[in-house]
C-alpha cells in the first residue's frame, strides 16, 4: 500500500470514469486504514460505540440509543448495515430486529458522518474524544433540525455511559460551503473566523464513517482553483451521481483574516498549553508566509493520494503537518524552531521511546515515531529527558520556558506585523490583537517585583520533596544578605558547595516564587538555616500557610473582560515583620515588658514602633503577582499610601475593593500588630471611598505622617515633629479637605481635639487661657489651621478684635457672593479648651460682641501689588489714609503716632486690624480666611512694634 501509479484528471483531455473510481477507492483505502488504526486503541465498549454510530443515525428504533420518535430525521445516505454492525446492535438490544429503510439515497436526510480530531492519527490517546460531523440535507426544517439535535444529545449520553466522549456537530452542507455554519462550536477553533482552516483540517484528517463521500477528493490538486468548473462537469455530465457525494467547498484561497485569526486563537491557547498549540500556531504562521497562494496541508495530502504515495504513516495528519513545518523552517533557516516542533510532536504523541520494549509489543504509533526519531538523529539521552517530562523540575523547565516564550513572542510580533500589512483586509479587530498582547504581557513580561510563572504547561509538577532555605550572609561578593533555596536537605557546611535553585534579596519574594510555581507544596519538607534573621520553623510554616490561603494555585484563566480593562488589585496579603523580632533586645534578655501604652506604633514609654517591615503581595485582575518590601521608619505610611493609590477609584471604573489579608508571626505582639495594621488599612480605605479630598493623620513614635487622598492621587508626607506638622497644617488649600486622625495620633495634645472638630463652610475659633497669655487656634472654611499666642488681659479683649475682623471679612465675602458666585456666608463658632483633672475637653462659647471701643479702633488695611511684585500697603485710621507712597518706610511709625494722639489713656495696649482688603492680590480667586489672618498678623506685629517704640 506504499506506492501506486500516479493518477491524473484533466477537463481539457477528458475525464476517465475508471480513474475516478480508482481515486475514490484510494481515498477509501486510506480512510479504512485510519479507521482500523483508530479501533486498535479503543476498548471493546468504545469500539462498539464507533461501530454503531452509522446505524444509530440511519434508523429510529425504540430499543436503540438516540430514539425520540419514528419521525425524527434519520437515514444515512447509501448506508447498508452489514452483519457485524447488526450483531453489535443485537448484543446491545437482544430483541432488536433490523428493517432496511425504503428511502432512496437522495431522500435520506443524513448525507454523511465523519470523525474529526486525533482519532486514527499518530496523536490518538486512550481517552481521545470522538468529534462527529453530522452532515445533513439543507432542506431540513428548523423543527426537524431541533429533533436531530435532541437525537444527537441522546447518542452522546449513551456513548458517555460506554466510556466514550462523543460530540456531535450538525453541518448543513449547503450553508457550510457558503461559510454559514449553524454549529459555531467546532473543535479546534474559535468558531467564528476559521472556516477554511477548519475545512483544511477536515479534508486532511476526517475519517468517513458512512454516507456520501467528499466531492473534493475527485478534483485534482493542481486544479483546485477550477474546483467549481470540475464539480459542474462531474455532476452535470453524470460522471458521478449527486447522491454519492457532498460538496463542502474548496481550498483554492484562504483569506488573510483566517490564518491571522487562527494564529491569535492558537497563541492564546499556547500560553497555558504550549505543546498542544505550537504545532497549529506555527502552521498558521507558515500559511501566512505563503499568502495569497497557500498550499495548505490538505492539498499536499491530496497530491500524495493522486501520486500514489499511500503510506499511512506519511499520510498521518500530524506527520503531514510536521512535514509542512519542516519544509517551512528549513527554508527559514531556523533549526532551533524546528527542534522545538519535533519536541512538541514527540510530547503530543506521548509514546516513550527511551526505554526497552519488545518489538512485538510496539504499536503502530510507537513504530512510526521510531522512524521519525531515527530520521532526526536524536540521541538516547534526549529521548530519556523527554520521556521523563513528568519528573521535570525547575532547571529543565526554565530552559524549556525560554524557548517557548521566545517562540510565542516571535509569533505574536509576526502576526501583528502581518495584520498591519493586510490592514482592513485582515478582518482582525485591533481589540483582539491588543487583548492577546495583554495576555502575553501578563503571562511572560518581566518587571521589577513581579513573580514569574516559569511553568506555562511545560511540566505537570515542579514540587520538590526536600528543600533547604538559607540566609546567605553579606560578604565580599554580596553587599547585603540574601535568601536562597537549595534542592535536598543540606547542612550548614554543605550548602556553600551547591548552586541554589533560586535566590532573592527578600525572603517573601523567594517563598512567593516557590509557591506560585509549585516548587514548594504541602508535601515539601524544608530545612532552615536562618542566618542573622529571627525566622523560625513555626513562622516559616505560618508564612507558607498564608501564601496557600492567599493564592490557591493553579490560578484561573483571566477573562477577556478583565484584560480589556486596566489592571486593578484583586487581593492583597500584607506580611508584617517577616523574620524580624521587633523587641529582640527584650527577647534576648528574656524580659517581658509591662506597660499601659500598648499601641504597636507607639509602644511603652519610649513609644517604640513595632512595625519594622512589611511585605505586600498583590494579585491583580491580569493574574500578575507582585511583591514589594518596605522597611525603616517610613515602611508603614509608604506601604499604606501606595496601597490606597492603587485601589482608589479610577475614572470609568466602579470601585471594586480588593480582598485584604494581614498576617504577622513574629515572636512578640504578633496578633496585636496584625490587628492594628489591618484596622488602619481598612479605616483609611473606607475614608478613600468617600470620594472627596481628605487627609489622614498617623503618628508613629514622635513622627507624624499625613496622607492626602483625592480621586486623582494619594500622597504621603512625613513630618519629623510637632512644629513641622503645625506648619504643614497651616498651608493654604484649594478647597475643603476633611482631616481624620488615627485614634492614637496627638494623644494628650489639644491640637488633636481641635483637628478632629473641623467642619466645612465654617470658621472655628479655639482658645486656651494660660495665666497671662492665651493661644488662639482657628480652622478656616477649607480646614486650614492658623495659630497665634498673645497676651491675655481678659476674654473680651482676647476675642472681640478677632470677631470684629472676621465679621468684616464675612461682610466683604457676602458682598462679593452676588457678583462672583462666591459660596454663601460662613458660620463663626467659638470653643474654649479646658483641662479637667489633666484631661482636655472642649466647650462651645457664644461669639463675643464686637462693640466699638478703645481697643477696637477703626483700622483698615488695603494691599496691592507694586513694582517687582512687592506688596504695597495702605492703612486707613478712622478713614484717614496713610500710604507707603507718602510715608515710605516710616508708614507704621506715622500710623502709630496718629493712634497714640487719639488715645485717652497713656498706658500702651495693642491695636488690631478691623478690616483687610486683598482683592488686588487675589484677582483671579477668592482668598481663604487663612490668607487674611496671615497678613493680619504681619501688619499687627509691625504696628504694635511701632507703638512700643514711640
Please report, for each region that a protein language model flagged, where it lies by residue:
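Nucleotidyltransferase catalytic cores
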Residues: 1-91, 179-183, 199-950
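Well-ordered mid-protein domain cores that form the structural environment of catalytic cofactors
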Residues: 68-127
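Short, charged/polar micro-motifs that form catalytic or ligand-binding hotspots
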Residues: 103, 135-145, 327-334
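Catalytic metal-binding acidic patch
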Residues: 114-117, 121-147, 165-170
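Amphipathic alpha-helical scaffolding segments
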Residues: 130-140, 147-153, 342-343, 359-371
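E2/UBC-UEV (E2-variant) core
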Residues: 147, 151-165
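Short, conserved secondary-structure transition motifs
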Residues: 164-186
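Acidic, Ser/Thr-rich peripheral helices and adjacent loops at domain boundaries
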Residues: 187-195
Amino acid at each position: 500500500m506504499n506506492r501506486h501509479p500516479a493518477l491524473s484528471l484533466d477537463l481539457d483531455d477528458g475525464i476517465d470514469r475508471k480513474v475516478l473510481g480508482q481515486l475514490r477507492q484510494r481515498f477509501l483505502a486510506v480512510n479504512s486504514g485510519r479507521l482500523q488504526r483508530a479501533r486498535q486503541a479503543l476498548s471493546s465498549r468504545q469500539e462498539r460505540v464507533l461501530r454503531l454510530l452509522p446505524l444509530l443515525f440511519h434508523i429510529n428504533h425504540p430499543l436503540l440509543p438516540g430514539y425520540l420518535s419514528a419521525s425524527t430525521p434519520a437515514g444515512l445516505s447509501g448506508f447498508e448495515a452489514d452483519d457485524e454492525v447488526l450483531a453489535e446492535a443485537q448484543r446491545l438490544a437482544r430483541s432488536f430486529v433490523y428493517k432496511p429503510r425504503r428511502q432512496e439515497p437522495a431522500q435520506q436526510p443524513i448525507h454523511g458522518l465523519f470523525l474529526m480530531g486525533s482519532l486514527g492519527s499518530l496523536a490518538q490517546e486512550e481517552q481521545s474524544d470522538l468529534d462527529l460531523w453530522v452532515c445533513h440535507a439543507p432542506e431540513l426544517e428548523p423543527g426537524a433540525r431541533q429533533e436531530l439535535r435532541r437525537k444527537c444529545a441522546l447518542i452522546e449520553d449513551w456513548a458517555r455511559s460506554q466510556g466514550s466522549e462523543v460530540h456531535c456537530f450538525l453541518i448543513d452542507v449547503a450553508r457550510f460551503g457558503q461559510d454559514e455554519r449553524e454549529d459555531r462550536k467546532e473543535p479546534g477553533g474559535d468558531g467564528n473566523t476559521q472556516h477554511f482552516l477548519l475545512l483544511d483540517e477536515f479534508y486532511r484528517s476526517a475519517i468517513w464513517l458512512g454516507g456520501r463521500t467528499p466531492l473534493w477528493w475527485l478534483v485534482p490538486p493542481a486544479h483546485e482553483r477550477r474546483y467549481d468548473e470540475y464539480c459542474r462537469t462531474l455532476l452535470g455530465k453524470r460522471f458521478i451521481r449527486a447522491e454519492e457525494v457532498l460538496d463542502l467547498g474548496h481550498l483554492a484561497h484562504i483569506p488573510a483574516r483566517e490564518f491571522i485569526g487562527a494564529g491569535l486563537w492558537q497563541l492564546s491557547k499556547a500560553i497555558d498549553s504550549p505543546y498542544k498549540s505550537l504545532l497549529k500556531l506555527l502552521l498558521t504562521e507558515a500559511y501566512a508566509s505563503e499568502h495569497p497562494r497557500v498550499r495548505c496541508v490538505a492539498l499536499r495530502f491530496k497530491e500524495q493520494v493522486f501520486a500514489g504515495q499511500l503510506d499511512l504513516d506519511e499520510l498521518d495528519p500530524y506527520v503531514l503537518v510536521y512535514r509542512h513545518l519542516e519544509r517551512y523552517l528549513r527554508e527559514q533557516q531556523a533549526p532551533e524552531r524546528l527542534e522545538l516542533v519535533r519536541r512538541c510532536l514527540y510530547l503530543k504523541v506521548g509514546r516513550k521511546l527511551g526505554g526497552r520494549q519488545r518489538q512485538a509489543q510496539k504499536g503502530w504509533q510507537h513504530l512510526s515515531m521510531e522512524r521519525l526519531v531515527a530520521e532526526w538523529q536524536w540521541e538516547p539521552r534526549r529521548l530519556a529527558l523527554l520521556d521523563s517530562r513528568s519528573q521535570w523540575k525547575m532547571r529543565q523547565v526554565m530552559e524549556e520556558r525560554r524557548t517557548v516564550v521566545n517562540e510565542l513572542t516571535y509569533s505574536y510580533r509576526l502576526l501583528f506585523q502581518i495584520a498591519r500589512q493586510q490592514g482592513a483586509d485582515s478582518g482582525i479587530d485591533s481589540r483582539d490583537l491588543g487583548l492577546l498582547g495583554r495576555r502575553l504581557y501578563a503571562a511572560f513580561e518581566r518587571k521589577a517585583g513581579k513573580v514569574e510563572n516559569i511553568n506555562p504547561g511545560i511540566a505537570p509538577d515542579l514540587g520538590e520533596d526536600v528543600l533547604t532555605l538559607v540566609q546567605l550572609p553579606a560578604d565580599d561578593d554580596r553587599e547585603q544578605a540574601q535568601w536562597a533555596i537549595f534542592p535536598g536537605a543540606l547542612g550548614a557546611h554543605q550548602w556553600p558547595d551547591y548552586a541554589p535553585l533560586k535566590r532573592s534579596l527578600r525572603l517573601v519574594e523567594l517563598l512567593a516564587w516557590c509557591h506560585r510555581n509549585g516548587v514548594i507544596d504541602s508535601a515539601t519538607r524544608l530545612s532552615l538555616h536562618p542566618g542573622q534573621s529571627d525566622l523560625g520553623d513555626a513562622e516559616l510554616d505560618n508564612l507558607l500557610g498564608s501564601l496557600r490561603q492567599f493564592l490557591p494555585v493553579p490560578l484561573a484563566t483571566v477573562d477577556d473582560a478583565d484584560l480589556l480593562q486596566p489592571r486593578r488589585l484583586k487581593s492583597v496579603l500584607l506580611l508584617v515583620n517577616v523574620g524580624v523580632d521587633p523587641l529582640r533586645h527584650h527577647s534576648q534578655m528574656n524580659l517581658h515588658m509591662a506597660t499601659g501604652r500598648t499601641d504597636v506604633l507607639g509602644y511603652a514609654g519610649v513609644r517604640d514602633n513595632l512595625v519594622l517591615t512589611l511585605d505586600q503581595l498583590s494579585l491583580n485582575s491580569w493574574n500578575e503577582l507582585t511583591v514589594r518590601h518596605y522597611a525603616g521608619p517610613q515602611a508603614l505610611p509608604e506601604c499604606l499610601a501606595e496601597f490606597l493609590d492603587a485601589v482608589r477609584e479610577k475614572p470609568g471604573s466602579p470601585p471594586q475593593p480588593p480582598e485584604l489579608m494581614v498576617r504577622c508571626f513574629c515572636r512578640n505582639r504578633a496578633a496585636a500588630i496584625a490587628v492594628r495594621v489591618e484596622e488602619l488599612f481598612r479605616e483609611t480605605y473606607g475614608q478613600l471611598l468617600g470620594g472627596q479630598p481628605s487627609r489622614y493623620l498617623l503618628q508613629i513614635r514622635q513622627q507624624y505622617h499625613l496622607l492626602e487622598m483625592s480621586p486623582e492621587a494619594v500622597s504621603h508626607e512625613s513630618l519629623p515633629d510637632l512644629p513641622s506638622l503645625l506648619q504643614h497644617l497651616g498651608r493654604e488649600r484649594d478647597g475643603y479637605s476633611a482631616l481624620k486622625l488615627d485614634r492614637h495620633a496627638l494623644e494628650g495634645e489639644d491640637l488633636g481635639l481641635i483637628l478632629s472638630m473641623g467642619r466645612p463652610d465654617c470658621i472655628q475659633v479655639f482658645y486656651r487661657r494660660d495665666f497671662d497669655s492665651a493661644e488662639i487656634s482657628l480652622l478656616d472654611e477649607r480646614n486650614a489651621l492658623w495659630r497665634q499666642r498673645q497676651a491675655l488681659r481678659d476674654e473680651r479683649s482676647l476675642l472681640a478684635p478677632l470677631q470684629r475682623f472676621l465679621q468684616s471679612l464675612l461682610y466683604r465675602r457676602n458682598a462679593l457672593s452676588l457678583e462672583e458666585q462666591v459660596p454663601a456666608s460662613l458660620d463663626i463658632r467659638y470653643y474654649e479648651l479646658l483641662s479637667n483633672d489633666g484631661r482636655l475637653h472642649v466647650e462651645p462659647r457664644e461669639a463675643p460682641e464686637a462693640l466699638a471701643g478703645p481697643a477696637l479702633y477703626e483700622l483698615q488695611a488695603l494691599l496691592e501689588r507694586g513694582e517687582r511684585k512687592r506688596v504695597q500697603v495702605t492703612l486707613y485710621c478712622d478713614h484717614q489714609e496713610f500710604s507707603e507712597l507718602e510715608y515710605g518706610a516710616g508708614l507704621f511709625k506715622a500710623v502709630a503716632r496718629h493712634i497714640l494722639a487719639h488715645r485717652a489713656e497713656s498706658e500702651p495696649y495693642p491695636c488690631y486690624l478691623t478690616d483687610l482688603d486683598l482683592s488686588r492680590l487675589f484677582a483671579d480667586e477668592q482668598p481663604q480666611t487663612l490668607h487674611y489672618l496671615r497678613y493680619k498678623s504681619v501688619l499687627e506685629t509691625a504696628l504694635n512694634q511701632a507703638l512700643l517704640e514711640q
